[in-house]
Structure formats: C-alpha cells, structure tokens
Amino acid sequence: MSQNLYPPKTTNPYIEDIDQYHRLYKESLENPKEFFNKLADENISWLKDFDEVHNESFSNTKWFEGGKTNVSFNCIDRHLKNNATKTALIWEGDDPSDSKKLSYQELHDEVCKFANVLKKLGVEKGSRVCIYMPMIVEAAFAMLACTRIGAVHSVVFGGFSPESLKDR
C-alpha cells in the first residue's frame, strides 16, 4: 500500500526549511542558555521573569527558575487580541461526524466558566483535582480551568469503572 504524505501548509512557519532547523539545533547545543532564553522571552508570557534559564545541575535540573507563568493564559488569553475568532481546539469523537471546532474566544469562555464552577466548589491554587471524564471536549476545559486557577490536576483513564477507582 502506498501512502502519500503532505506537509501541512502554513503562511508563516516557525522553521522555514531543514537548513534553518539544523542552525537552530546547533545553536541550542552551543549556546543553550541564550537559545532558550530567547525562545522563552518570545513565546511565553511571564507573570514574573525568571532569574535563570537553566541551573545545569544534572541531578536536580530546573528550568526558568524564579519565573512565574500561567499555562491557561499562554494557551488561550494571549491569542485573544489577534486570533479570537481563529480555531483554537478541534475535538473529534469516536464517530468522525461528531466533531467540534472552538475559537480562542469560545475556548476562553468555556474554560472561565469551568474555572468558576471549580472555585465555587472550593478549588483554589494548590488544590488537587482528579479529572475522571470520557474523551470529550469538556475534559480539555477541565484541565485548562485547573491550570487557570493554579490547581494541580491528574487525569484518570475514563475506561476505569468507579468501583475499580475506589481501590487505587
């Protein structure tokens, strides 16, 4: 069976070609602190700037120490100004005809609603949340809502029965 592979088309690719990839790779090896500092500054919104890119301790590696960010903000909010109506999330059910596309604005609205429900239930920064849901679009809302309010989340395989989970 022959298979044709077609690279995704983009109007503004991050890496133009294989030569640029090799240059970036080489730079990441030769000047890792400068390389990752530049990437972090350009691609992540920070609530508090980091003190050090990498501590170079092999046994206790830490990246962007002292920095503070919010994953939910970086995944959604920072795209609202210029891309609110663009597709942020595509979900497809077991039946391919069952699918949803959400814009950044729609995703933002749903995640904020979910975060507010969690807060009303007493979830706050540092809380631990176990997400036991099927593979539905709301599972993504739950994960992003937890990161939005600073709660730690763990996703449990939805195929386990409630009875089997109580002993785990």
List each language-model region with its residue ranges.
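C-terminal catalytic core of Y-nucleophile DNA break-rejoin enzymes
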Residues: 158
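Conserved AMP-binding/adenylate-forming core of the ANL superfamily
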Residues: 89-144, 161-166
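Structured binding elements
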Residues: 150
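Anion (oxyanion) recognition and catalysis
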Residues: 147
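N-lobe entry segment of adenylate-forming
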Residues: 1-102, 106-109, 113
